[in-house]
Regions:
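Sec/Tat signal peptide C-region and signal peptidase I cleavage site
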Residues: 16-21
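Core beta-strand residues in small-molecule sensory/regulatory alpha/beta domains
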Residues: 54, 58-64
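Extracytoplasmic
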Residues: 54-56, 85-89
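SH3/SH3-like beta-barrel fold
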Residues: 76, 90-94
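Sec-dependent N-terminal signal peptides
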Residues: 4-14
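Boundary regions of SH3-family modules and the immediately adjacent low-complexity/disordered segments
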Residues: 22-47, 93-161
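Beta-strand cores of secreted/periplasmic/IMS beta-sandwich domains, seen most often
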Residues: 78-83
């Protein structure tokens, strides 16, 4: 009985792994998620903070701070779509494919050009998720689109003053 149960579990996990691997082939699109930004205003971030990644919100294992911290969010977060809200948290997909939870008060939809339905398209590229912005979508942390502090831009510019 134990051997047949163990065999069934092993077979089931191999089938599930095969389905999972097939679904996540490099370059394949990921559905069920949408791009949001962290809310720089709610987090009181300066452009310098955003450039350096200071003050970005934590990501948790579950929909509570007590569930354990997985890490810190990036500027663009991939939210489960439609939004999966629980206890003030929103479920997200992290860059490496892990599921996490972030406070719903520190994220917001992407900026969009007037009349645009722009969002994003996600794809799995081996071991990372990549996003491509749809026409009209802006991955800006600040309304004016000037995310790069002037001193950082000039230091990295190919065109000297």
């Amino acid at each position: 009985m134990r051997k047949s149960c163990l065999g069934a579990i092993l077979l089931f996990s191999m089938i599930c792994h095969g389905v999972h691997a097939e679904r996540l082939q490099p370059g394949s699109p990921l559905s069920g998620y949408q791009c949001y930004n962290i809310d720089a205003e709610a987090l009181k971030l300066t452009p310098e903070d955003a450039w350096d990644g200071k003050g970005f919100p934590p990501v948790f294992r579950g929909p509570s701070e007590d569930s354990g911290k997985l890490g810190v969010a990036s500027g663009v977060v991939y939210v489960a779509w439609p939004l999966q809200k629980q206890n003030g948290f929103v479920q997200i997909l992290r860059l490496g494919g892990d599921v996490g939870w972030i406070s719903g008060s520190v994220i917001r939809p992407l900026y969009r050009e007037p009349g645009s339905k722009g969002g994003c398209t996600l794809s799995w590229n081996g071991n990372l998720i990549q996003f491509h912005l749809d026409p009209g979508a802006k991955a800006w942390l600040f309304r004016d689109g000037h995310n790069i502090p002037e001193d950082k831009y000039l230091a990295h510019s190919l065109h000297p003053e």
